[in-house]
Amino acid sequence: MTVQTVKILSELVSTPVDKLLAQMKDAGLPQTSASQEVSEVEKQVLLSYLKRQHGEEGDNSQRITLQRKTTSTLSRDGGKAVNVAVKKKRTYVKRDDEEAQKQEELAKRLAEEQERLAQEKARLELERKQEEEKAAKAKAEAEEKARQEAAVKNVVADAGAVNETEQYVSDTGAAEPVESPKQPKASKKVSQPAMDSKKSTVAPKGKKGPVRHDNDKDKDKPRGRVNPDNKRTSRVNVNDEDEFTRRGKLGRKNKKPSKQEHGFQKPTAKMIHEVALPESITVADLAEKMAVKGAEVIKIMFKMGAMATINQTIDRDTATLVVEEMGHTVKFIDENAVENDMIEAIDYQGEAIKRAPVVTVMGHVDHGKTSLLDYIRTTRVAAGESGGITQHIGAYHVETPHGMISFLDTPGHAAFTSMRARGAKATDIVILVCAADDGVMPQTIEAIQHARAAGVPMVVAMTKIDKEGADIDRVKNELVAQEVVPEEWGGDIQFVGVSAKSGEGIEALLEAVLLQAEVLELTAVPSAPAKGVVVEARLDRGRGSVATLLVQNGTLKKGDIVLAGLQMGRVRALLDETGKAIDSAGPSIPVEILGLDGTPEAGEEFIVVADERKAREVANFRQGKYREVRFARQHSAKLENLFSEMGKDEVRTLNVVLKADVRGSLEALIKSLTDMNTDEVKVNVVSSGVGGITETDATLALASDAVIFGFNVRADNSAKQFIERESIDLRYYSVIYNIIDDVKSALSGMLSPDLREDIKGTAEVRDVFRSPKFGLIAGCMVIEGTVYRNKQIRVLRDDVVIYEGELESLRRFKDAVNEVSRGMECGIGVKNYNDVKVGDKIEVFETVEVARTL
């Protein structure tokens, strides 16, 4: 064995001698110079030390690493040789018997698993092929059966034409058999419908092409299906219309069909849909339910005489006609199912007790309704109201010696018709106020009609009986003319004379009301969830939406979930009519609540529900339905007016942004303003709402060139600055009369003026002569008024107008003058007219514009 020194060892391991000596010293070996010898044992000691330094542990005697270096010479074209050294390093590991055994077991298990998977795959493939063959066979049988039935029908249809059939047989030699051929090879051509339908897909035998394979290993297998006899067959597809396109190149659809290709035609029977129709539906949604295009529905509607667009909302009756016209069936659905289910789930059962009556005071304006209530309540409401008139519904409850009574005070002005109608619906008894010195007035008659429409009994209070000129008998006679007959005259209505100033008759009036309430036997269930009506609603800064409710049944508590019309919310606070916080309100108690997410419409019914999620769902549904109805109404109006507006002059519009303090006053204002609309001018309420005037309202008014009306509200600071900067017209009002008068005068100014002809004078022709400069001149005598030179004239002959024009010259003697008075002679030259005769009259007139009023 060759003896190695430290120097030789350093060359073998490619390590500097100094570094190797340092490592040997650290390993505890005695070598200190490069010439000293190194034994095999010392090499192993050094190797073990180095392995420990590099983190390797354990006995690695099973591992051996071999390095080999080979040197070769590479000759280049220039004759220069290049030495090439190749170093190779390999490591061999000798595994122990236990590890080798584990590796063999693992390999064996892997082989078994692969074999099992291959068998399972083969079984699934065989089942799939069998299913495809069954499906293809079933389709082929169905097709053959259809062909047979078609052939039989053709033979039956041709049975009546015997001569033509015989001629056809003689020409062709033999008729084709009716039965389908037993051998599929008998037909060498595929029928044209089968070729056009492209329902089959054939993989041609031996044809090479970019066919998609499930596995790369299948690339060498013959294309097509292999049956159990190892015979290749072509694959037939009758299910997938695009199978061939997916498996072949684009543009290679028109391949020659094989003998096994089957024809398949789509079913041509029309699909009849059952269309579920709500109360209203858009044309687009209706078309979607019938699986047709919107244009088809519009075409049908045009044929039926109805103009429509794809986004137009139509009613259920129109939709039913369209659906039946297109051959489908109709099924009506109830959109209010969720709402009805929620209402039906509320239990109003319980012990019924007697409740206080709800009394509405109605009558003509300034007949003393609020003053009468003031005396009963011992307050001074009327003195604090703008203009001394009531402009929203007030709700109060009063404890009297005879029992509790809840009062609703309604406005008497003509603009508040809807408020009076709501007051009549929400009440049990109506006190009809009629002034003894004024008698029956228009709003008195209207209040009678509202009470009768609501089926509410009346008690007549004749006010101002202590005033001079009061005539109770006259009032009774006028009311009898309206079929309101007092008890003493044989009727069923109590008449009571009262004075709100002295208090005369007040006790008798309250007794009459409570007597009527006893007859009605009014009851309620206090333990049930509350329900009633919204009397009024407004938007209050700092508190949000404030709604005045009248509880008709049940008890309203703080924290209840209230659903009122389009709005809902949890009751955050309950306030009585004096502003005092309370925890609950029973039947017949008016109360203000905070917590709704908006201002509900006055007159809406409210209920208390247990599930907040359902309440929000119903509120959202009502809002969506309201939007649909409003859009349908607007769209219908546009279509109806489309042709009627053609040829008319443009309507002048006064744009208005309207803000009010309460919802009822806002509604009355909108109705009063829109009632002023005519064919020439109209009021367009661009925006309306409850609450103060904001910068958003001012911006909208600027964009739409509108006037801002604030009724008992004011603009905030930012809105004031914006309005002053942009010079927007802002008007504040506290009395509804003033708004109506101002708008009426503004609309009157927008009307086109009337043209009126004002006759200034008449001259009679006494002689006719010619002038070389002016032609025919009429010598006239002014018999009426004054004749002016610069005004229009008419020539009358036997009091019939024969010419209308203007004067060319007016002279007295030889001087040209501007006017000639009555009783004086003058010469008149008529412009472009030379047929003046003696006895004609020349009438001078002026067209005057006269301002119109509404």
From Swiss-Prot:
GO cellular component: cytosol
Basic residues composition bias: residue spans: 247-257
Gene3D superfamilies attached to this UniProt entry: P-loop containing nucleotide triphosphate hydrolases (3.40.50.300), Putative DNA-binding domain, N-terminal subdomain of bacterial translation initiation factor IF2 (3.30.56.50), Translation factors (2.40.30.10), Translation initiation factor IF- 2, domain 3 (3.40.50.10050)
Regions of compositional bias (Basic and acidic residues) in chain numbering: 128-150, 211-232
Region (G4): 463-466
Binding site for GTP: 363-370, 409-413
Record-annotated tr-type G domain positions: 354-523
UniProt cross-references to PROSITE patterns, sorted A to Z: G_TR_2, IF2
Stretch list, region G3: 409-412
Ranges where the record places region G5: 499-501
Residue span of region G2: 388-392
Region of interest: Disordered: 52-79, 128-265
Protein localization: Cytoplasm
Keywords, comma-separated and alphabetical: Cytoplasm, GTP-binding, Initiation factor, Nucleotide-binding, Protein biosynthesis
Major place of residence: cytoplasm
Its biological purpose: One of the essential components for the initiation of protein synthesis. Protects formylmethionyl-tRNA from spontaneous hydrolysis and promotes its binding to the 30S ribosomal subunits. Also involved in the hydrolysis of GTP during the formation of the 70S ribosomal complex.
Family membership: Belongs to the TRAFAC class translation factor GTPase superfamily. Classic translation factor GTPase family. IF-2 subfamily.
Protein name stated in the entry: Translation initiation factor IF-2
